[in-house]
């Protein structure tokens, strides 16, 4: 990993999890105010999570501690999954890169409910996502495929 990496990918997140539910879990485990970006990609055909999430921590040191705390985590509040979480560095790194990746995504269209969109926080309090810098395309629903703007693998 490169120095200064702060964004992690959590795998084996239960399909029932949304950003709100994941934020609640992270806060309950003592990580309140440690993160400033959370996104749980959703399959809009089934209206369920796709099994992973992205979290940006406020420093590399916090990211490394977060990885240690959640790698192998099995305490999900869900009947959907009892798989252990595995932690990875995200391809997209840092708050600015995550904002750039999603601010002009079809995911940010008005018709997409807010609870399916990425969340930004400052000192543990939600803040508004920056406005798009260009015209947003409508989110396309494609059979058998994930929706655009869902994340990376």
Language-model features and meaning:
Residues 103-153:
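Non-catalytic, charged low-complexity extensions flanking SF2 helicase motor domains
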Residues 74-103:
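Low-complexity RS/RG/RGG-rich segments used by eukaryotic RNA-binding proteins and nuclear co-regulators
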Residues 1-50, 58-83:
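Canonical RRM/RBD RNA-binding surface and closely related RRM-like beta-sheet modules
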Residues 18, 53, 94-98:
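Alpha-helical structural motif
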Residues 55, 62, 86-94, 109, ...:
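Alpha-helical solenoid scaffolds in eukaryotic macromolecular assemblies
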Residues 4, 34-36, 81-85, 111-117, ...:
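Generic structural motif recognizing short loop/turn segments at the entrances and edges of beta-strands
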Residues 46-48, 74-76, 93, 121-127:
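Low-complexity, flexible helical/coil segments
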């Amino acid at each position: 990993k490169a120095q200064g990496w702060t964004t992690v990918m959590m795998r084996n997140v239960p399909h029932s999890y949304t950003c709100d539910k994941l934020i609640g879990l992270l806060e309950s485990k003592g990580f309140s105010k440690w993160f400033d970006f959370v996104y749980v990609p959703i399959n809009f055909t089934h209206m369920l999570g796709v099994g992973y999430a992205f979290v940006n921590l406020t420093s590399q040191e916090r990211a490394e501690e977060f990885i240690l705390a959640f790698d192998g985590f099995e305490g999900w509040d869900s009947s959907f999954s009892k798989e252990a979480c595995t932690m990875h560095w995200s391809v997209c790194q840092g708050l600015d890169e995550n904002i750039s990746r999603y601010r002009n995504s079809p995911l940010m269209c008005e018709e997409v409910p807010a609870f399916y969109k990425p969340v930004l926080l400052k000192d543990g309090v939600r803040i508004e996502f920056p406005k798009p810098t260009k015209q947003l395309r409508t989110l396309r629903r494609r059979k058998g495929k994930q929706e655009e703007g869902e994340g990376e693998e």
